[in-house]
Design a protein with these regions (language model features):
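Hydrophobic alpha-helical transmembrane segments of multi-pass membrane proteins
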Residues: 107-114, 143
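Transmembrane alpha-helix/helix-exit interface in multi-pass inner-membrane proteins
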Residues: 66-87
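N-terminal signal-anchor/start-transfer transmembrane helix
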Residues: 30-50
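Hydrophobic transmembrane alpha-helical segments in integral membrane proteins
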Residues: 13-35
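Loop-to-helix transition at the N-terminal end of transmembrane alpha-helices
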Residues: 50-71
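N-terminal chloroplast transit peptides
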Residues: 1-12
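Short aromatic-rich membrane-water interface segments that cap or initiate transmembrane helices
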Residues: 94-107
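Hydrophobic, aromatic-rich membrane-embedded alpha-helical segments
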Residues: 138-161
């Protein structure tokens, strides 16, 4: 009984705050992340001295995405009696079973969007502090981080290393 009440409460919270369905939550998350990335690009190009403004927009967007992630995760856990008992993070098969639930897929996507945006914001700041060209940051680092986060991180690390090395 308490589990069904919690599940209904979480579902109502998600519907009220995030959308009528998990698909709508997914779409809203994408739109919000796009806004966050666009703001990050514009501020990186034109607001070199506005680090706080750039950081706050990216962090607020990531915070909202994180809250949506938390609601979906709690909703899944509250309704997990229907989930496979073999679903876990200890094996590839277990993770595959977890991702059969659309709430988990959407939560995973929101997790990806939030973290990559936070990493993109941080890489932008690090590159600016180390004198990496904004053209490289906006033209290469941010798109790579958006599409393939770890690749953007590696690219940025190489750019910063080369920039520091060339200064000596």
């Amino acid at each position: 009984m308490p589990t069904s009440i919690a599940r209904r409460g979480l579902e109502s919270l998600r519907r009220l705050a995030l959308g009528a369905s998990v698909s709508e939550t997914f779409a809203r998350g994408n739109a919000l992340a796009s806004f966050g990335w666009l703001t990050l690009v514009v501020k990186t190009l034109f607001g070199a001295n506005e680090r706080r403004a750039r950081a706050s927009v990216a962090r607020v967007v990531a915070g909202v995405l994180s809250a949506a992630y938390l609601v979906l995760l709690c909703e899944f856990v509250a309704g997990s009696s229907s989930a496979s008992p073999l679903a876990s993070f200890s094996s590839l098969e277990g993770v595959s079973r977890l991702f059969r639930d659309e709430r988990v897929v959407c939560a995973g996507w929101l997790h990806y969007l939030a973290f990559d945006l936070l990493i993109g914001e941080r890489l932008s700041a690090i590159e600016r502090e180390n004198g990496v060209s904004r053209v490289f940051t906006v033209g290469v680092t941010l798109p790579l981080t958006f599409i393939a986060g770890p690749v953007g991180y590696l690219w940025s690390s190489a750019c910063v290393w080369l920039t520091r090395r060339n200064r000596r």
